[in-house]
Amino acid sequence: MLKTRQCLLGIRTFLGVTSRIWSFFLYILRKHLRTIIQYQTVRYDILPLSPISRNRLNAVKRKILVLDLDETLIHSHHDGVLRPTVRPGTPPDFILKVVIDKHPVRFFVHKRPHVDFFLEVVSQWYELVVFTASMEIYGSAVADKLDNNRGILKRRYYRQHCTLDLGSYIKDLSVVHSDLSSIVILDNSPGAYRSHPDNAIPIKSWFSDPSDTALLNLLPMLDALRFTSDVRSVLSRNLHQHRLW
């Protein structure tokens, strides 16, 4: 009887140790997988267009892609403010020093994963326009960093170009171009494009997730959308009501 109890105790101890070792192994594996995903080489092959596709593209107007900044392409926080979504000690991609109301403020800016690659690809398909509800002194500095002397983010609109309605800033796309059939807006805030929901592609807000792939997931759709004669024929299908990316 005593030997049986000792045997059972030994088995329980062995299983307990094995379980802890396995849990630790899984923790290390997940940690390394996140690192691999974060720094993996990204490709989106742009194949030559067929004659039919080329003719189709030549028959329609070149589209405009309007891009929001905060929580769409980047996330930032300023001196003394660290949102719980940003892991303490996470280094920013760049730091901006701006003067607001005569007070110097430092912004610590984190770029959404794959944003540089995303901009490089979509700039070949669309005219890119920045439209942010942020102040110009901040938004312009962020856009300069994302542009990185490539000349792809030349047109920019800021808070003064928005309409203030019930405490929210609304982006009027007719300010960008009068022909709304050729304008697409990518914004994490549905309220910002509520005047033009049929021109919008929704995207989930981004704060700190290093494994986020929302921008990459959008590339096939944006690639196809440029061939349409009116983007609203596709985007009007209630995409703004769903968090697809």
From Swiss-Prot:
Its EC number is 3.1.3.16. It is found in: Endoplasmic reticulum membrane; Nucleus membrane. It catalyses: O-phospho-L-seryl-[protein] + H2O = L-seryl-[protein] + phosphate; O-phospho-L-threonyl-[protein] + H2O = L-threonyl-[protein] + phosphate. It is a single-pass membrane protein. PANTHER family: DULLARD PROTEIN PHOSPHATASE. Serine/threonine protein phosphatase that may dephosphorylate and activate lipins. Lipins are phosphatidate phosphatases that catalyze the conversion of phosphatidic acid to diacylglycerol and control the metabolism of fatty acids at different levels. May indirectly modulate the lipid composition of nuclear and/or endoplasmic reticulum membranes and be required for proper nuclear membrane morphology and/or dynamics. May also indirectly regulate the production of lipid droplets and triacylglycerol. May antagonize BMP signaling. This is CTD nuclear envelope phosphatase 1A. It comes from Danio rerio (Zebrafish).
